[in-house]
Amino acid sequence: MAHKKAGGSSRNGRDSESKRLGVKRFGGQVVLAGNILVRQRGTQFHPGDNVGIGKDHTLFAKTDGTVKFEIKGAARRKVVRIEPLAA
């Protein structure tokens, strides 16, 4: 009788789904309250004026306005703030 040996098992073939992190609204863009500005792990970007931070460190707009990115302080922190639209 003809026989075929069992094939070996592979130990590869796994990969995690991408998390789609990064800046979602860029400097100078007009945003509405609630818009997500940055998705991140940890605080690469810190919240400034009119910006909130979620429990997963997501930054979001608290008011309608224009997005501004700045570097502040001796620690050279990247800060995102919203400049409210002139009424």
UniProtKB/Swiss-Prot annotation:
Gene3D superfamilies: 2.40.50.100. One of its GO terms (biological process) is translation. InterPro entries: Ribosomal_bL27, Ribosomal_bL27_CS. The keyword Ribonucleoprotein applies. Keywords: Ribonucleoprotein, Ribosomal protein. Residues 1-20 are annotated as: Disordered. One of its GO terms (molecular function) is structural constituent of ribosome. One of its GO terms (cellular component) is cytosolic large ribosomal subunit. Belongs to the bacterial ribosomal protein bL27 family. This is Large ribosomal subunit protein bL27.
